[in-house]
Amino acid sequence: MAENVQNPPVEPLAVIGMSCRFAPDLDTPGRLWEFLRAGGSAVGEMPDRRWDPYVTDSRTRDILRTTTRKGSFMRDIEGFDAEFFQITPREAEYIDPQQRIMLELAWEALCDAGLPPTSLAGTDASVYVAANSNDYGRRLLEDLDRTGAWAVNGTTFYGIANRISYFLDAHGPSMAVDTACAGSLTALHVAGQALHRGETSVAIVGGINIMASPALVVALDAASATSPDGRSKSFDKAADGYGRGEGGGVVVLKRLSDAVRDGDPVHGLVLASGVFQDGRSDGMMAPNGSAQQRMLEEIYRRSGIDPGTVQYVEAHGTGTQLGDAAEAQAIGNVFGPGRDGDNPLLIGTLKPNVGHVEAASGIAGVIKVLLGMRHGELPPSPHEEPDPGLGLEARGLRLVAEPTPWPRGEHGMRAGVSSYGVGGSIAHAVLQQAPPRPDRTERPAAAATGRPQVFPLSAASEQGVRGLAGSVAAWLRAHPETALDDLAHTFTARRSHLSRRAAVVAGTTEELLGGLDALAGGEKSPAVALASASGFGDGGAAGPAWVFSGHGAQWSGMGRELLTTEPVFAQVIDELAPVFSEELGWTPREAIEAGGPWTVVRTQAMTFAMQVALAEVWSDLGLRPGAIIGHSVGEIAAAAVAGSLDRAEAARFACRRARALGKIAGRGAMAMVPMAFADVEQRVAGRDAVVAAIAASPLSTVVSGDTAAVEALLADLEADGIQARRVNTDVAFHSPHVQEILDEVRQAAAALRAGTPRVTLYSTALADPRSDAPREGEYWATNLADPVRFHQAVRAALDDGTRVFLEVSSHPVVAHSITETALDAGVPDAHVAITLRREQPEQRTVLANLARLHSLGTPVTWSYDGDLVDVPAVRWQHKPYWIFPDTAPEQGAGLGHDPQTHTLIGARTTVASAPVQRVWQTELHMENRPYAQSHKVVGVETVPASVVLNSFITAATNEGERACGLRDIVFRIPLAAHPTRVVQVVLEQDKVRIASRIKRDQESGGVRDDEWLTHTTATVVHEPEVGARPMEDPDVIRARCPVSWTWAKVDGIFRTMGVDGYTFPWVVEELLRGEDEQFSTITVDHTPKLHPSSWTAVVDAALTASGVLVMDENSNVLRTCSHLESLSFVGPPPPRIHVHTVRDPRTPDTISMTVADESGAVVCEARGLRYVKVQDIGSGAVGPRDLVHELAWEPVEVPADAPVPSQALVVGGAAGGPALVEALTARGVRARAVPDATAIGDASLTCADVVVVAPEALLPGEAPEQAARRCAQLLVDAVQQVAAVPDERRRPRVWALTREVRAGATEAALAHAPLWGAGRIVAGERPDLWGGVIDVAENAVPQQVASLIGALPHTEDVLSLDSEGVTAARLRQVARPAEREPVDCRPDGTYLVTGGLGALGLEAARHLVEQGARRLVLIGRRGLPSRSRWDQVDDPAVAAQIAEVVALEAAGATVRVLSLDISDAEATARALDPGALDMPPVRGIVHCAGVVSDALVEKTGAANLDTTMGPKADGAMVLHRLFPAGTLDFFTMFSSCGQLARLTGQVSYASANSFLDALAALRRSRGETGTTSFAWAQWIGRGMGETTGRATILEAESRGLGGITVSEALRSWAYADRFALPYAAVMRVMPDHTLPVFSHLSVTDAGAQSADAGGVDWATVPAGELPELVLKVTHEQVAAELNLAVDDIAIDQPLLELGVDSVLTVALRVRLHRCFAVDLPPTILWSNPTVRALAEFLAAEVGGATADAEETDPVAGLPAPQQGSGTAEQLDAVAAAAG
């Protein structure tokens, strides 16, 4: 048939993008097509949650009982990615889900079109959306008490379209259309008119329908419009009304010419459209076939399209007999003439598939037709039997019954789509297949060559971008033939680049998949960049500051790869050849290919050549600088790239400047000094041959000058403990050396003509970094002669807003300086990218940094050519947003919860918060426990974990979620059933928790928010994690588990430990144990007490039986579940189960279990069930307050009549030695000074004389750690010389003088500090010849010192002398209010542990992970084998270390193990260099490294001191210099308090530990409050405590020093962190101690018998007064332990919520035990979590004990023995949370 040429059609409209979401979960056009082609039906039961709020009212309940409850429902209409659209959770609740879904669909459709949504900002893009019901919005507006401002836009039709326009910042027409079911075709028509009239250039068109309330269904049922079974039977004999459906669709339209011009994909064409009205007919809702016919005829007439050219009509097809008949007649009359059985018009509709989506039905039909055209096929229109009454065949029509090839006509595939509204509006559109695409230009594919490219992904959150990576990887595996060029083009040019970005560098599909998998899995990969951009989209971001560094980046091989891979690089290199050849006799290409030698001339000239060529590479990749900085010679390239200098002229100048510098080569040197520029200037003042040359950063300066002068300066610096390093150059740049060549440089620069730079160009040569002085003439002399002010230029850029820097060089030279400057400026979010790195693949290094820059938000003009592919563009991060009306359902049993459901789900309410919380509240007491049998743990009736977990699942299911399990379950504290509690289950998005408070007798005064105690938290899992798979063959498992335990045996162990009873009736038939696994078979007795569909009993049985695996026959340690990674299940609970439990070999306290039914099918899985020990005070354990001590000083009286020694020998050559000799002589003492101890033996001394060891603290050029060895050795030598005197009557006493060690403010103090420790040991070994240590303050005079020597009692360890007098060291408990918050580890920081593979180091590492550390570096001298060999390790010790590292990683930490001698400064600096470490900045250090070299003082030699001082003192100093005061959050050093007890054989060890103590004081004096030296007592069973001999332990205890357990040590560490202590001695004080340093300490455990209870004798308190008094005292004791005022603690506030952690729980139990003489079980806070509850418990115990005493004991006041309370050593509560 011919077209009607009298009415030529207007320009067709191109459909360039589309998206959809239909029931049940058809969220892409592809999934919709497969569903349609298969004849699928989405009809199902209405989700219970939808109408639940309406059935609580008896009136509506009766109505809804007969309302149609079937239809095509989407599974998720609450889910929305609010964060993506920058909508607050609170506002999202008030936005109609139709608006939310359309936002997402609009974004998806634009991405499908390859039209970056953010590119529409400010354009005339338009939005036309159809909707005709606002169930959700209407309900919100009617809820007057709770409606808010957000409902204004969130509940309306206009808001659907306007919100899209608002988010996209689109300025074209934006409107909602409501013509009922004709709405979306009406929107299409209106959009087409606007496009034809030029009102808009791109139109977003869609329709949406959601059924959020039953109101419209009730009305439609009343009108007999709906089908009872919810199914639309279009054109079917059984048609009985339509089935409602949910869904939406969006298409994106452009004029065809515009789409072709822009290279857009074209899914199909809209040739014509029209909207008409039925007018007055048989009824407003009645169909009008005549009007439909007139509409069709008019549309085709106007458009000039012959209806005979249409092969298919997507009919309205509601499925009502009247409507189908009218439509069939109209279609037949218009399209039927001339057709026969061989050429029928094919008709169909998708309503039988996805329901009648009403306002969205027209757009749904359009999408179906476009998909059919794409595939050249028509999907079936499901039906049972065509209605013969319609006469389809006679009318030339045929209903599509099966997938049918689309008949082709002269114009290809054509179709009509009809939609008719219930109010009489009718619409129709004519579609045609897309024109053929232009032939693709052939080009070499990147995948064929392996040429790497950058593939960027982005989202609004890290979860979104990782999820997108997973989606893309799955898509790519399904489409492996996809060209990488097309993917790169799609990702770079056809997507918006959002705020959270990632980019993968890959050259092959396999590489790309590897990077995507790493990104999706949260793994680190060098091929993947991930960062947050500075803003949403690229619009406002500035380019990075390009930094052209100076001398030192050269390396052999640089540039070679780029010559072959980057044409623009080679082009620039070759462009420079004539200039270089003329000036220097060689070309840049020749230099690159030769790879050296790197003379100063060649290095300087090639620095310019490489930099300008690399800059061209960056420009070619689409990067533009936001600013430019040059450093020394780098200023030349900087000026050229900025456009200030012509590149050829700049090259000539660079060559001539380089040639001039060659004349002064070989005479100079440079060095990097870790000091500020001004400080270095002061340091070199007066030195003629060395100057401060480069201000690199606030912390680093480069000096330059004569070689000898530089070396001398380095030696002086090293003597002061400052580690400087030489720079690899023999030219003294920026020093007086360059004066002789300045005229030559000026002459070379004279030819330069500087222009205005195109970009901000900072100066490093001038005082003002922002100076616009022209880069010509004298500027370049200044550049060479004056200091480089790099620090100032970078700081100016930072102050001007620059946050991203790019070093353009062959190797990073200044990147570290930029980072230091940024941190000093308080800009932690500054980032530095590089260009190349030595020996690294060049092209990939450049692209990896391009990926990083893009991820940071740097604008990139991408230039990847290719075609658009339909790879996923977004992975929505849905969270539920929904507001139900408040209801008051009838209370079930138990004031809300029904015990028979095995949940604590009570009365439901909604809390208006952001996001909205759903809360179920009930009361729990002994009579309404939601489990079948009593379950007591240590006498506390405890709700089992299975009930809590079931409550969580039930809450999510009640809210309409598809709850398939839980993850990240944290058991904070068990829930006790007594006393009566008010319990809440709270669901907030996908987070769920259970909390309780104790119900008070009188609650009229209201309830405080802080009375609630959270017990357990979890996250709901919406997708099933239990796959359809069988369990491993039970017989195979049984074979590996040869040991059989009867349940009677297990029950006996449980009951011995205090677990009394199991919550549900189940029977363990068999329990077989292997080494790390267990197999059990259990029958669950489903008695009438058990709800038949409840998993609670099965989970309870499985968890209880599985918990047996973590205990043995002698288990006596209380354990409780602390965390469960995941729990999932599927199907109904089976009555008989097999349970396979496996212990994690890396973490023995963690198990996983798999549960199968009798057929072997897995029905339930639990992963990562972790048990932790509950802290117990036991019989000897104490709180940290009793263990942590600090050093104090008390006055000592000097005897007035003390004897004066006859002779004194002053040994050591201290500067103050002569003055001391003079002062002693003045007192009548024959005194003299000698340089060393060898003179002692010949001095003819007697026991009435003294030897004074007084070494010089620091010799010239001596480091403190070297001086410390010398000083300690001098003392040892002196003691050895005295001890060697045969006649004991001639042995004088040895005294040691130290200076300012107590003050700790100088490095000299470090040198003398070992004398404190060594002296204490000598006092223990040789009390017969020891005098003591006197520490002299700066203000003390020699006469004071002389008066003390020999006069003071030699029983003291250390005496301090200052102008105020003499004081002695004493330990005292740290018992004062906390001075600061405990230091938590940052997840974005790195933490070092030296000695990290030792026992204490690994304990420290575990402690750091528990405090939040997620990146650890464990440093050990030996390290570990490579990870690939870990499975082959047979050394048990190494294998144990590997297991510990794996356990740390399993706990969430990234662990790097370094084999490193921490005392090697250079090796340590290299290993911990930020570039080498490739980890976040180091935030904290725990220095555990230590080696013992025991020997009596007479046998101690230099080797002993070297052995112990090396790792401890030298290692600490290396770290101190690398991380100066102020650069760390904490620096914790492990010292020892063995010296305090004067332990035998530890001279060298005590010397090293005293050095650490002094270093902590030094750092504190410099303002760092995070440095502490912990002087530990023996850790029982750990570290050196494992190998300490029994004799040493007995010696320590006899002198008052007792060991501590690991848990006590870690609790003490956490406790001490609350105070600003430079030194903390952690120890247990034993009875009968006599040493003066312990004189103020009471025995650690003695307080258990008495505590400050205000002098109360509880036995005498009248019963009526007891509760009030106990409450008062308990309140005071709790406040004292927490260091809070009594008024700051509410008596009904849970102590756990006040910060009472495991450390303070133990301390609190200890304190209350001392006060009341009542044993408090470790479970006390489970059942008594508040001050009031504790007091009630204590009053009952005290009262009961008093009553018993009165009845049984005539002695008043003696408490009766406590029976049956149980201690932690009697418990292993694997059932506490599990069963």
Curated annotation (Swiss-Prot):
It catalyses: 5 malonyl-CoA + acetyl-CoA + 3 NADPH + 7 H(+) = 5-methyl-1-naphthoate + 5 CO2 + 3 NADP(+) + 6 CoA + 4 H2O. It is an enzyme of class 2 (transferase). Residues 1746-1771 are annotated as: Disordered. Residues 1664-1742 form the Carrier domain. The active site is at C181, H316, H356. It comes from the Bacteria. Residues 902-1027 are annotated as: N-terminal hotdog fold. Gene3D superfamilies: 3.40.47.10, ACP-like, Malonyl-CoA ACP transacylase, ACP-binding, Malonyl-Coenzyme A Acyl Carrier Protein, domain 2, NAD(P)-binding Rossmann-like Domain, Polyketide synthase dehydratase. Keywords: Antibiotic biosynthesis, NADP, Phosphopantetheine, Phosphoprotein, Transferase. Its EC number is 2.3.1.236. Pathway: Antibiotic biosynthesis. InterPro entries: Ac_transferase_dom_sf, ACP-like_sf, Acyl_transferase_dom, Acyl_Trfase/lysoPLipase, Ketoacyl_synth_C, Ketoacyl_synth_N, Malonyl_transacylase_ACP-bd, NAD(P)-bd_dom_sf. One of its GO terms (molecular function) is phosphopantetheine binding. Residues 902-1180 form the PKS/mFAS DH domain. One of its GO terms (cellular component) is plasma membrane. The modification O-(pantetheine 4'-phosphoryl)serine is found at S1702. GO terms for biological process: antibiotic biosynthetic process; DIM/DIP cell wall layer assembly; fatty acid biosynthetic process; secondary metabolite biosynthetic process. Polyketide synthase that catalyzes the biosynthesis of the bicyclic aromatic compound 5-methyl-1-naphthoate in the biosynthesis of the antitumor antibiotic azinomycin B. This is 5-methyl-1-naphthoate synthase. It comes from Streptomyces sahachiroi. The gene is aziB.
